[in-house]
């Protein structure tokens, strides 16, 4: 059991992190949305960032409400909020993976004809790919929705005589729900890993090819991109692992360590959100023009 003062401290840290992420997400959507209305078109990277901003905005509010309901044992409200959090969490993972795929397709120097064909097709169909990620999320959330319904049924049966066979089946399906959610996160994470490794290999190859003993502007740009990619890789991998541990939920007494753990998790999410803000040329150009 941790002291109440420490619990309050980490609760405040978590709330401040969450509000910062919400403000960042709102800023991304507002700035890029305004640009979209003015020029009537956006680059694919900005389409992803707007989608990510909306998804992360909803995810963060769902997370805050979910955690406070969990802490104060509001179980019926918690069940309804959990499915919302899971939906936007899976969608956020897919959108992050698509962003990395876009950078890999756009910036890598591979010249194989299959890769060039994929680049042409993906860039041409990017709005439909975004819609596809939303549809995949809707499909993968179905087991969680069923598990959420089962959880509510288990809560209503808590004070009633139970049929042990039925209860065991319900609890087994509830465990399957967590496995399905884990798989739904692992697939886009593998896509992220593959795209990141390919892009890092391509950038390293370009640096070695253009190395002439002195640092020209092209070399500096490649070094900067490689460094940014390495930071994004570390932050997103840490984010994935912390979310995975949160889903498994077997490490800590959830009520006792809730705010310590959430403050730790959302520190990574805040770093990732900040790095995404800095990845959009359009966003950086507009914000610099306002200063």
UniProtKB/Swiss-Prot annotation:
Quote the subcellular location field of this record.
Cell membrane
InterPro entries associated with the record: TAS2R (IPR007960)
Transmembrane regions: 2-22, 42-62, 85-105, 126-146, 183-203, 229-249, 258-278
Give me the Cytoplasmic side stretches, as residue ranges.
Answer: 23-41, 106-125, 204-228, 279-291
A GO term for molecular function: bitter taste receptor activity
Gene Ontology cellular-component terms for this entry are:
endoplasmic reticulum; external side of plasma membrane; trans-Golgi network
Membrane topology note:
Multi-pass membrane protein
Q: Methyltransferase: present as a keyword of the record?
A: no
Entry annotated with the keyword Transmembrane helix: yes
User: What are the glycosylated positions?
Assistant: 80, 163
Query: Extracellular side: which ranges?
Result: 1, 63-84, 147-182, 250-257
A Pfam family matched in the record: TAS2R
Q: SUPFAM superfamilies this protein is in? A: Family A G protein-coupled receptor-like (SSF81321)
Q: Which UniProt keywords apply?
A: Cell membrane, G-protein coupled receptor, Glycoprotein, Membrane, Receptor, Sensory transduction, Taste, Transducer, Transmembrane, Transmembrane helix
Quaternary structure and interacting proteins, as annotated: Interacts with RTP3 and RTP4.
Q: Which PANTHER family match?
A: TASTE RECEPTOR TYPE 2 (PTHR11394), TASTE RECEPTOR TYPE 2 MEMBER 16 (PTHR11394:SF68)
Provide the function of this protein. Receptor that may play a role in the perception of bitterness and is gustducin-linked. May play a role in sensing the chemical composition of the gastrointestinal content. The activity of this receptor may stimulate alpha gustducin, mediate PLC-beta-2 activation and lead to the gating of TRPM5.
Question: Other remarks?
Answer: Most taste cells may be activated by a limited number of bitter compounds; individual taste cells can discriminate among bitter stimuli.
Family assignment? Belongs to the G-protein coupled receptor T2R family.
Query: What is this protein called in UniProt?
Result: Taste receptor type 2 member 16
Q: Which organism is it from?
A: Pan paniscus (Pygmy chimpanzee)
